[in-house]
């Protein structure tokens, strides 16, 4: 079944205050669109500041793919308000454009219409754009325009002091890192519950399949919407951002050093497939290098151990320096029923589940078990709502009904919820009551609700209706925690920071590239 966490929960019930101070941050991606739903081909609006250096508003793969970032904080309502204010501000300054409310893009006629994110003339800015050029040439631009929500989560030092006996984060970085890797292993084993509950991409526009081979047996509506009747998150399927060449990297999550060792090997491992592309076409650079990963961020993962980097530090060097500081959950689709793409219920569930993941026993995991876990995830991603769906337990032949495993998990989460609610309110317990019902009635899941709308309206109609509704809602709402003046200050500061980077460059881009890549 699932690990017995009763002793750990009893221990936590005796120490309820050690969970005070959980820190969270949210990152939300969204495409800028025109009034008819087409991808905006305009530059990143100058009224939003410089995407390279803005603290809260940047771009991801494409110039039209906005990314909103909240600072880390310990107040859920403040984080939601902060993210809402970023959306309100953006809606106010977009000129006749709106934000696409779904994970999967729709009205993109051709990949040539997708402009890579531009970050100015500095070497670091050009490097970021070249990395995206490499992604386009390796995997195609369309799949890089898929949007998601990332959730950053860290437990307070008081928890680690009580749980593993550390004195502080610096001296206890190895034990804390081991705790987060324990969380990650349990996430791989049981995190399929996230797409089951919150997957919101059960369908795609037929244009997304143009020129792409797929073994999926899609059903189609008259307007060209393609769907799988029991799917939860096609964003997380191999139609989305996956990398077949990464499947044999054997990166494991048993401890910090083996993880980093695997990651560093991957960024230096040559790829025959990508070598055929070369690094230049004439005088134009087309990728950073020909290795399996151009940089560490190219590694596809539903969860990542993270530490804030300093200067030009790589993510793995930051982890080596200070250990794991927080984890980044990358399995959330955009929630179409929330103007900001995510809601408080989802955040509170993730708190509960991630705490459970760190409490539950987590034996070391080899690459074979990791493959078994991925098959479980895939089963839920493609057929999670199928009546009687089974879920594998470990790598043997043992299977249990998904609903049974889900309910058992929630019996533990209810105890975690009571602990978190012990200081005030019943919000976490209400989340449990709401979500456990989905295991008896899958029509209550996000994917089922979304699919019903998409089948009746088409993806385009559904997305456009919501984009219009949310635009009007956002521009009519008042700011809650950030003022117009603060947005203006950060906009000017971001431009000044980018200008400074461009002035301070002392070497040519080719020299910079050689320094960064070693080749």
Curated annotation (Swiss-Prot):
Gene Ontology BP annotations: glutathione biosynthetic process
GO MF annotations in UniProt: ATP binding; glutamate-cysteine ligase activity; metal ion binding
Signal sequence, start to end: none
E.C. code: 6.3.2.2
Pfam families: Glu_cys_ligase
InterPro entries xrefs: Gln_synth/guanido_kin_cat_dom, Glu_cys_ligase, Glut_cys_ligase
Keyword flag Repeat: no
Pathway given in the UniProt record: Sulfur metabolism; glutathione biosynthesis; glutathione from L-cysteine and L-glutamate: step 1/2
Keywords, comma-separated and alphabetical: ATP-binding, Glutathione biosynthesis, Ligase, Nucleotide-binding
EC main group: ligase
PANTHER family noted in UniProt: GLUTAMATE--CYSTEINE LIGASE
Protein name: Glutamate--cysteine ligase
Species annotation: Photorhabdus laumondii subsp. laumondii (strain DSM 15139 / CIP 105565 / TT01)
Organism classification: Bacteria, Pseudomonadati, Pseudomonadota, Gammaproteobacteria, Enterobacterales
């Amino acid at each position: 079944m699932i690990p017995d966490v009763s002793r750990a929960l009893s221990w936590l019930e005796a120490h309820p205050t050690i969970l005070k101070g959980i820190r969270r941050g949210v990152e939300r991606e969204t495409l800028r669109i025109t009034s008819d739903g087409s991808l905006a081909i305009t530059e990143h609006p100058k009224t939003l500041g410089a995407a390279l250096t803005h603290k809260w508003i940047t771009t991801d793969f494409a110039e039209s793919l906005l990314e909103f970032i909240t600072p880390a904080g310990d107040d859920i309502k403040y984080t939601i308000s902060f993210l809402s204010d970023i959306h309100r501000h953006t809606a106010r300054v977009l000129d006749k454009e709106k934000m696409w409310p779904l994970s999967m893009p729709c009205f993109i006629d051709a990949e040539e219409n997708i402009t890579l994110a531009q970050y100015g003339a500095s070497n670091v800015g050009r490097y970021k754009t070249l990395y995206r050029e490499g992604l386009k040439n390796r995997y195609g631009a369309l799949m890089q325009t898929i949007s998601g929500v990332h959730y950053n989560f860290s437990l307070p030092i008081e928890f680690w002091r009580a749980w593993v006996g550390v004195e502080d984060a610096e001296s206890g970085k190895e034990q804390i890192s081991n705790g987060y890797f324990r969380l990650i292993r349990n996430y791989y084993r049981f995190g399929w519950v996230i797409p089951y509950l919150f997957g919101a991409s059960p369908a795609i526009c037929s244009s997304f399949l143009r020129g792409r081979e797929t073994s999926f047996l899609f059903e189609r509506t008259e307007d060209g919407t393609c769907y799988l009747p029991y799917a939860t998150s096609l964003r997380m399927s191999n139609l989305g951002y996956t990398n077949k060449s990464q499947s044999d990297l054997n990166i494991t999550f048993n401890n910090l050093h083996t993880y980093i060792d695997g990651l560093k090997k991957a960024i230096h491992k040559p790829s025959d497939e990508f070598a055929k592309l070369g690094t230049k076409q004439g005088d134009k650079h087309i990728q950073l290098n020909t290795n399996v990963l151009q940089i560490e961020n190219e590694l596809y993962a539903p969860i990542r151990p993270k530490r804030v980097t300093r200067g030009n530090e790589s993510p793995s060097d930051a982890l080596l320096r200070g250990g794991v500081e927080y984890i980044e959950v990358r399995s959330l689709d955009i929630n179409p029923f929330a103007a900001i793409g995510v809601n408080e219920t989802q955040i509170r569930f993730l708190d509960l589940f991630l705490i459970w993941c760190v409490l539950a026993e987590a034996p070391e995991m080899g690459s074979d078990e990791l493959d078994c876990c991925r098959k479980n995830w895939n089963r839920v991603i493609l057929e999670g709502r199928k009546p009687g769906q089974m879920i594998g337990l470990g790598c043997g032949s043992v299977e249990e009904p998904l609903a049974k495993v889900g309910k058992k998990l929630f019996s533990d989460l209810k105890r975690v919820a009571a602990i978190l609610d012990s200081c005030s309110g019943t919000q976490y317990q209400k989340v449990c009551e709401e979500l456990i019902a989905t295991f008896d009635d899958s029509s209550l899941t996000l994917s089922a609700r979304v699919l019903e709308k998409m089948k009746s309206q088409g993806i385009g109609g559904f997305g456009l209706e919501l984009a219009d509704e949310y635009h009007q809602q956002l521009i009519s709402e008042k700011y809650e925690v950030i003022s117009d003046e603060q947005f203006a200050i950060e906009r000017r500061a971001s431009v000044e920071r980018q200008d400074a980077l461009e002035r301070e460059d002392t070497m040519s881009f080719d020299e910079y590239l050689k320094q960064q890549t070693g080749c």
